[in-house]
Amino acid sequence: VLQFRPVGYMQINSQLMHEGMAEVYHQQKEIGYDSTFIEGAADCDKYMKELLPDWQAQGITSVLHEKNSGYGPNREANLGFKKLAEAAGAKILEGVQATNLITANGSGAVSAVETSQGTIECSQLVVAAGPWVRTFWEMLDLPNSVKIKQPDGTFTDEIPMWSYMALEEGELDVDPHSYRTAKGTEYPVIHVDTESTLVSNKTGDVIHENEMWGFYYKPDVYRNGIQGGSSPYDVTKPANEVNIDPYGHKSDEFQPRAAFEDKFTSAMAFCQKQFDGCHAKYKKQKAGGIGCVTPDRFPVFDQYRENVYIIADANHGYKMAGVGDLVSDE
């Protein structure tokens, strides 16, 4: 019902990421999650070329290959979750906007939610609003700034509680079905993080040098092309001035910057020889979205105002279903 494609996921890294990825691998082993961890430049290169013979990325010293991960279609997956929720007894009201939270007399607990279509009384409220979490945080009169404890025990000055980051994503106009590994399987989702020098495949200019950069790509049968993206960039506006709507592809304000096309296509050529010159197949179209993040970029899953549980995470995808499951148990 979710149309998930378990093609696998590969986290491919330089030495700076090795320790963190090794820890992730050991955590996966503890819970029985099927993955392989390859260490050392020579073994990594051999492993990748056995899968993708034209692999040529330099400076790679570890590969975490998650066998059961993958990707799926955004809209169809959401409709699938809707069916599962309704089958479990949930009632979903679409096109409704929450406008205010009403607190009980003499208590900080929320007793009702005012919406564009009436008031809904509640004994427990769960807020899982993605980039709109800022709005509910304000409704709950929670602090707009925080002080962060540093490693030396001192605290920073007041830092805004919320800020936004914008995704940079794009696609190549190619037939995704034509891409297969040496084993005849679909490509896994490929994610690379490295500080190796990245040179423009189009101009020869240096894009990244002596700094960490990353991106991902995958042949996507739902988008009919190769889809991918790179690290999000900071939105410089204060959170309360950011226009979240219209969101995603409908937004004119938050779109990939001009330099993204060159970085994305050059990074693909950095990884695989066959993508040399692939900038000619880059789709000129709108893409992306924005995420709301905390000062340390870590998510918040916690109880507030006695009976309000907030899931504040800029991530997305199937892993959030796992978060929802854990929150429902709690």
Q: Where is each model-derived feature located?
A:
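Dinucleotide-binding Rossmann-like beta1-alpha1 core, especially the glycine-rich loop
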Residues: 1-51, 214
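Helix-loop-beta segment of a Rossmann-like dinucleotide-binding subdomain
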Residues: 2-11, 43-89, 94, 110-112, ...
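General small-molecule cofactor/ligand-binding pocket signal
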Residues: 36-38, 91-93, 281-285
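Mid-domain beta-loop-alpha active-site segment that forms a flexible
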Residues: 63-84, 129-132, 259, 263-267, ...
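Active-site beta-strand termini and strand-to-loop segments that position acidic
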Residues: 66, 115, 219-221, 302-305
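Conserved positions in beta-strands of structured domains
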Residues: 99-102, 302
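Flavin-dependent oxidoreductases
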Residues: 101-255, 276-278
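C-terminal catalytic lobe of FAD-dependent flavoproteins
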Residues: 234, 238-243, 252-330
